[in-house]
């Protein structure tokens, strides 16, 4: 085979190989270091499942634990009573309470502030997992909190 023809065949093989890899599921290209969020939730909570789908879509790997004693999970994570919601997650040493948007979690992991975690208290309409078709989203704060229970506004939506 001539040198120019050999180069053409090699280029064609490279294109076919690249195209075949591109057909794989997006998960095949997810970085190995994508953060794992461990989510503790009630087995019957539907909005928690929607929030899990939201953070998965944002690229997080999610480990879901259905538990019946959420009070103990929240206490162990250091979530103050005033900041509590329906589910509690742990990611890279931080507690994430309630329907916190994925981009705020990403910001938390990038900035790495000296706090115990962040929370969206209650279940505000329009927060991830709490969307209601035809209803305007509520304004809400994402709070930061420390191990002593002190809270502050981390960001607002």
Where are these regions (language model features)?
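Boundary at the C-terminal end of the N-terminal hydrophobic targeting segment
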Residues: 20-24
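Bacterial N-terminal signal peptides
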Residues: 7-17
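Local sequence-structure signature of Cys/Sec-based thiol-disulfide redox active-site neighborhoods
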Residues: 31-52, 58
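Loop/turn elements at helix/coil->beta-strand transitions in domains of secreted/extracellular proteins
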Residues: 34, 60-61, 114-116
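Thiol/selenol-based redox catalytic cores and closely related redox-interacting motifs
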Residues: 76, 82-157
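N-terminal secretory signal peptides that target proteins for export/translocation
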Residues: 1-4
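Conserved helix-turn-beta segment immediately C-terminal to the redox Cys motif
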Residues: 52-72
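Stable alpha-helical elements in mature extracytoplasmic
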Residues: 44, 51, 66-69, 101-105
């Amino acid at each position: 085979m001539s040198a120019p023809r050999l180069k053409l065949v090699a280029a064609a093989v490279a294109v076919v190989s690249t195209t075949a890899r591109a057909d794989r599921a997006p998960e095949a290209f997810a970085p190995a270091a994508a953060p794992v969020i461990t989510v503790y939730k009630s087995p019957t909570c539907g909005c928690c499942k929607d929030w899990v789908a939201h953070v998965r879509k944002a690229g997080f790997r999610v480990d879901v634990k259905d538990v019946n004693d959420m009070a103990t999970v929240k206490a162990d994570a250091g979530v103050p009573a005033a900041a509590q919601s329906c589910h509690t997650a742990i990611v890279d040493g931080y507690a994430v309470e309630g329907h916190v948007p994925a981009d705020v979690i990403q910001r938390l992991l990038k900035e790495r502030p000296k706090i115990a975690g962040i929370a969206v208290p209650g279940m505000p309409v329009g927060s991830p997992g709490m969307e209601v078709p035809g209803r305007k989203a509520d304004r809400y704060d994402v709070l930061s909190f420390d191990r002593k229970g002190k809270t502050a506004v981390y960001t607002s939506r």
